[in-house]
Amino acid sequence: MAANIAMFADIEDYDDTRSCEYGYGTCELMDVDGVVASFDEGMLSASESIYSSPAQKRLALPPPKATSPTALYQRLQAELGFPEGQAMLFAMEKWNEDMFSAIPVHVDLYTEIALLSTSVNEVVKAGLDSLPIPTNYIPEVDLNAHGSEPFPEVPALEDELETYVISAQRFYLSELRAREEHYSRLLRGYCVALLHYLYGSAKRQLRGAGSDSALMHKFKQVVRDRYYRETANLARLLYLHLYISVTREVSWRLHASQVVNQGIFVSLHYTWPQRRKFECLFHPVLFNHGVVILENDPLEFNDLQRINYRRRELGLPLIRAGLIEEENLPLESEPTFSGKLPRTIGFLTHQIRTKMEAYSNAHPSTPLFPLAEHSYSKRIDGRLSYGTTAEAMMDPPSPSAVLPGDPVPPLTVGIRQTAETLALPSNLTLQSMETDVLDYSSISGDELNQMFDI
């Protein structure tokens, strides 16, 4: 029995007809107790106890006042409680893993935020319309907002594993969506403060001289030169925290429930049809002790070691895989970096740019001012685009390479040897096998092979 489960994508967006029939001939002969016993509590982290229950409500500070971009960045870092954020962003300049492009972008949350328009005129108008700066967020911004999906419990029966994986994914996506709704309002508050600071900067540069039209012209010039760059800096910190914090919370809660029920996952066939899904921050199953397939081939231990190295750096629980782990070898190995490949920071930036261009894509307009190309932006149909990196604009490694905006294929999972999939001869039932003495000599070789999936 196999099921195609859409992870971070609608099934209709991708047609995956590949089978999950892979030959790990020793899977059904494994000593389950022996395998699970090797995964001891030494791998547990203090994070597990921190995230053992849902995070409590945490309201954002009042909207920031007009102040310098540096001060706004520092305030945001403190408000999020994310002192390691800047160091993480810097480190991701030297990583190649695509940890973000399989995560949903939630474009619909940004289609009505005019402050994110790629038109300078629209941004300026939205900034002036936002005066005075509000003293509170309405509705309130909860930095620990939760979704409506219930937390999934590890099933007692293997037949329910596929439903469990679906439920784990739905829970994560529900938490992420709920949290991002609040983070988008937080970003808007910082954009307002930044715009008002830039307006004051334009006035100071004119030193009180000039007409209102001269001030407006100067303000638009300052917005064009600085607003997009500074907004992108704030957004990178904000959304990195969103993705990391939600994934940590959900992953460690899943880890706590799965670590004491590992034996059931030996029966699971798990396939990542694209490498970016294996490198993604979120994994619904953390103890993949059954068959594990990456891009049509059995997952190799060195791939597991490399992704676990990154997960450890990000404070995420490691991925365990009993069939491929090698005795006396570490579970982590530092990945090599290539400057010729896209970087992790580029994949994050692509996610952010897609969000921040949503308003202009939904409300197209033609800017009145010529737009210069900046090192932090990319011209798209004459519009100024939000910050990026050179790596994010690189040509793909090959014509067949998976790109961040490509549809995300469904995750493929299957269950090995359940009551429904066990190939029994027509004259046998599970009840008769339990109550009667089974004479294997009366069963043909082909039927025996089918029974034991050989």
From Swiss-Prot:
Protein's UniProt keywords contain Ligase: no
UniProt GO molecular function: DNA binding
InterPro entries in the record: Alpha_TIF, Alpha_TIF_sf
Compartments where located: Virion tegument; Host nucleus
GO-annotated biological processes: DNA-templated viral transcription; regulation of DNA-templated transcription
Keywords per UniProt: DNA-binding, Host nucleus, Host-virus interaction, Phosphoprotein, Transcription, Transcription regulation, Virion, Virion tegument
SMART domains listed in its UniProt record: Alpha_TIF
Gene Ontology cellular component annotations, sorted alphabetically: host cell nucleus; viral tegument
Assembly and oligomerization: Associates with the VP16-induced complex; binding to host HCFC1 activates VP16 for association with the octamer motif-binding host protein POU2F1, to form a multiprotein-DNA complex responsible for activating transcription of the viral immediate early genes.
Purpose of the protein: Transcriptional activator of immediate-early (IE) gene products (alpha genes). Acts as a key activator of lytic infection by initiating the lytic program through the assembly of the transcriptional regulatory VP16-induced complex composed of VP16 and two cellular factors, HCFC1 and POU2F1. VP16-induced complex represents a regulatory switch: when it is on, it promotes IE-gene expression and thus lytic infection, and when it is off, it limits IE-gene transcription favoring latent infection. May play a role in the aggregation of tegument proteins around nucleocapsids during virus morphogenesis.
Family label: Belongs to the herpesviridae tegument protein VP16 protein family.
Stated name of the protein: Tegument protein VP16 homolog
Name of encoding gene: 12
